[in-house]
C-alpha cells in the first residue's frame, strides 16, 4: 500500500479506499489483511498479473506511435571506450535523429525504461521482450602500457604470471581464469594482485602503467592504435559475445532500424 501510494503520489488511505471500492464492485476480496501484513488473495494476485500485462501492452502501444528520442543503453565502459568516440560520425551523417544514451547494466525493462536498443555482453541473458543478435565475438588479451611491457618482458603466459602485476575487475572476477582456459593453460593459476570496481577503471589503470589488464580488443583497439596500450600476447577468441538487444515492440521504428544497422557496421569494422 505504501509503495503504491508513493508511486501514485497519493496517501496510503486513498489507495486503501480504491482497493476496497474495487473489491465491492467485483464482489470478492483481493487482499488478505492480517494484523502485521497485507498479502494478495489468489484472485488478487491473478488480477494484478493480468492487469500488469495489459498496462505493459498499453505502454508499448503508446511508445510505438509517440514521437520522441530513441534511447540506447550500454555499460559505462562500452559507452566511454567504444560508442562515444564513434558517435560524432553518426550524428553528422544523421542530424535529424534524436538519440539518447543511458548507462545501465544487466537486464533491461524496455517498456518501463523506454529503451529501444541495448548493447550487452552475452554473460547477461536477454529478456523475452528483446530481439537479441550477436554483433561480434569477443576477443580478449592482456594489455598494458608500452613502458611497463618493456620493463616486465612478459613474453609468454608463464612469464606474465611470474613477473607481471595482474589487475582485475569486480564486474568480471573470472576473466583471467577464463583467459587461461581459453589458451589451454587452466593450470596457470593467474590471479589479480589488485581489483578495481569497474571495467573502465582497470583499463585506465593499465594505461597508466599499473600492470596488466585483461580486456576485449573491442574496448582497447583505439588506445593500441594510438600507442597508449600494447598487447604483447595478442588476443584470442573469448567465451562471450557482444550482443545487440532490440525492443520487440519498437523494431519497426525507422530511426531504430537505422541506428541498429550503424551499430552492426561499426562493430563489423572492429573485427
Positions of predicted regions on the chain:
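Residues within helix-turn-helix
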Residues: 1-6, 13, 20
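Residues within the DNA-recognition helix of helix-turn-helix
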Residues: 11, 18, 86
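A short LG(V/I)-centered, amphipathic sequence patch enriched
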Residues: 23-40
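Alpha-helical linker/hinge and terminal dimerization helices associated
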Residues: 25, 47-66
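Acidic, Gly/Pro-rich loop/turn segments at junctions of secondary structure
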Residues: 102-167, 171-174, 178-195
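Hydrophobic hinge/microswitch elements
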Residues: 187-231, 237
Amino acid at each position: 500500500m505504501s509503495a503504491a501510494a508513493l508511486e501514485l503520489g497519493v496517501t496510503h488511505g486513498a489507495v486503501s479506499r480504491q482497493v476496497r471500492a474495487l473489491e465491492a464492485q467485483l464482489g470478492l476480496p483481493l487482499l488478505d489483511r492480517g494484523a502485521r501484513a497485507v498479502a494478495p488473495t489468489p484472485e488478487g494476485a491473478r488480477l494484478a498479473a493480468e492487469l500488469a500485462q495489459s498496462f505493459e501492452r498499453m505502454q508499448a502501444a503508446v511508445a510505438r506511435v509517440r514521437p520522441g528520442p530513441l534511447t540506447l543503453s550500454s555499460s559505462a565502459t562500452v559507452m566511454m571506450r567504444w560508442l562515444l568516440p564513434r558517435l560524432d560520425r553518426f550524428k553528422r551523417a544523421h542530424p535529424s535523429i534524436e538519440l539518447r544514451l543511458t548507462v545501465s547494466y544487466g537486464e533491461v525493462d524496455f517498456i518501463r525504461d523506454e529503451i529501444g536498443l541495448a548493447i550487452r555482453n552475452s554473460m547477461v541473458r536477454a529478456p523475452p521482450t528483446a530481439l537479441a543478435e550477436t554483433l561480434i565475438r569477443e576477443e580478449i588479451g592482456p594489455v598494458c602500457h608500452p613502458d611497463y611491457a618493456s620493463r616486465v618482458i612478459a613474453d609468454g603466459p608463464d612469464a606474465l604470471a611470474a613477473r607481471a602485476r595482474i589487475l582485475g575487475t569486480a564486474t568480471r572476477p573470472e576473466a583471467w581464469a577464463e583467459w587461461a582456459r581459453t589458451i589451454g593453460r587452466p593450470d596457470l593459476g593467474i590471479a589479480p594482485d589488485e581489483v578495481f570496481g569497474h571495467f573502465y577503471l582497470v583499463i585506465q589503470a593499465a594505461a597508466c602503467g599499473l600492470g596488466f589488464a585483461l580486456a576485449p580488443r573491442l574496448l582497447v583497439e583505439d588506445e593500441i592504435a594510438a600507442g597508449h596500450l600494447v598487447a604483447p600476447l595478442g588476443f584470442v577468441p573469448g567465451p562471450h559475445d557482444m550482443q545487440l538487444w532490440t525492443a520487440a515492440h519498437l523494431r519497426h521504428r525507422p530511426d531504430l532500424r537505422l541506428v541498429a544497422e550503424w551499430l552492426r557496421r561499426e562493430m563489423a569494422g572492429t573485427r
